[in-house]
Amino acid sequence: MTLLALGINHKTAPVALREKVSFSPDTMGDALNNLLQQPAVRGGVVLSTCNRTELYLSLEDKENSHEQLISWLCQYHQIEPHELKNSVYWHQDNQAVSHLMRVASGLDSLVLGEPQILGQVKKAFADSQNYHSLSSELERLFQKSFSVAKRVRTETQIGANAVSVAFAACTLARQIFESLSSLTILLVGAGETIELVARHLREHQVKKIIIANRTKERAQRLANEVDAEVITLSDIDESLSQADIVISSTASPLPIIGKGMVERALKKRRNQPMLLVDIAVPRDIEQDIEKLSNVYLYSVDDLEAIIQHNREQRQAAAIEAEHIVQQESGQFMDWLRAQGAVGAIREYRDSAEMLRAEMAEKAIALIQNGADAEKVIQQLSHQLMNRLIHTPTKSLQQAASDGDIERLNLLRESLGITHN
């Protein structure tokens, strides 16, 4: 039995190719069933996200297995093999185990340490459970990988520092203000970045969120999700004085918030400090605003500096995480190798049980026919001893005859022979 991980990801293939080999949730059952029909496949899990498509498999035989499965992947998605040739990778046994643990821990992600991938791996595992495509080895491997991912996040700082613009903006706000629970925050725009910012802020239970957008309709959906008030861009001048923090990200070609607008807001606020974070390109907030007292203005470049520093911290945490993966993958492989002896142990025990039953049956019959019980027991013990030592004795003699000292010593050790 061997384990195999095979696939493509954001590092090896462009999005155009990743799209071609992705698996939709609607077809996952069919894909797993089809995969199990392939020669030597004992179990399989398909992980398909926007950044990767990977097959995790337990196989009866590893001979040319990755080539056969690459062919299956091409046939299933109706693409030519040459399209995958330079993009596909595969890992066997220990490397496959380490790879899954790294993936689940966010160590192989586009954004190092991102937590979403663990949920996606768990979903792939659940699909395989639902469609009965798991082997016992894969089930054990995935469960182990989940515990490794949890250990990585608990014992390292891999997820502690912001590495996205949205998260960095929220981190900056928390650094400047001790608590966000008493603050009003104005978000300008309603695109993807502002959506992420709004969700991060809601998690920190801010007092109030106001969303300003060109059209109220687009902003209303997000407002409903995070319990926010919606205004139009033209209402910003009137509402700006309420805001302790302003985070802006629109596609406007011209600034939306000018120096005069902020001066009026500060006057109404009696010069209480304001934090303005401009993550738009071109900028939404006039740069001259940074000259005003009690105003802290940060641009996307300032956030990038924070993000780069945090990336470096995550890289340091990733080194610790890699040590955890190395340790845990080694332990899993010890368990997996031990499973290779389970069948042999079971067969050996069954053989011994058959011998015991056979000898006991003969002894009982002799005693029932009037034979002396003590003589029967003596005879039985000698016969049992001879039967049990016959095969090991022949093996020892053969190893000695062949001059195979290594095998001879191994046999001696396994039989508990400690003296020459």
From Swiss-Prot:
Pathway: Porphyrin-containing compound metabolism; protoporphyrin-IX biosynthesis; 5-aminolevulinate from L-glutamyl-tRNA(Glu): step 1/2. The keyword S-adenosyl-L-methionine does not apply. GO terms for biological process: protoporphyrinogen IX biosynthetic process from glutamate. GO terms for molecular function: glutamyl-tRNA reductase activity; NADP binding. Its EC number is 1.2.1.70. It catalyses: (S)-4-amino-5-oxopentanoate + tRNA(Glu) + NADP(+) = L-glutamyl-tRNA(Glu) + NADPH + H(+). NADP(+) binds at G189, A190, G191, E192, T193, I194. Substrate binds at T49, C50, N51, R52, S109, E114, P115, Q116, Q120. It holds the Pfam family GlutR_dimer. The keyword NADP applies. The active site is at C50 (nucleophile). Homodimer. Belongs to the glutamyl-tRNA reductase family. Possesses an unusual extended V-shaped dimeric structure with each monomer consisting of three distinct domains arranged along a curved 'spinal' alpha-helix. The N-terminal catalytic domain specifically recognizes the glutamate moiety of the substrate. The second domain is the NADPH-binding domain, and the third C-terminal domain is responsible for dimerization. During catalysis, the active site Cys acts as a nucleophile attacking the alpha-carbonyl group of tRNA-bound glutamate with the formation of a thioester intermediate between enzyme and glutamate, and the concomitant release of tRNA(Glu). The thioester intermediate is finally reduced by direct hydride transfer from NADPH, to form the product GSA. This is Glutamyl-tRNA reductase. The gene is hemA.
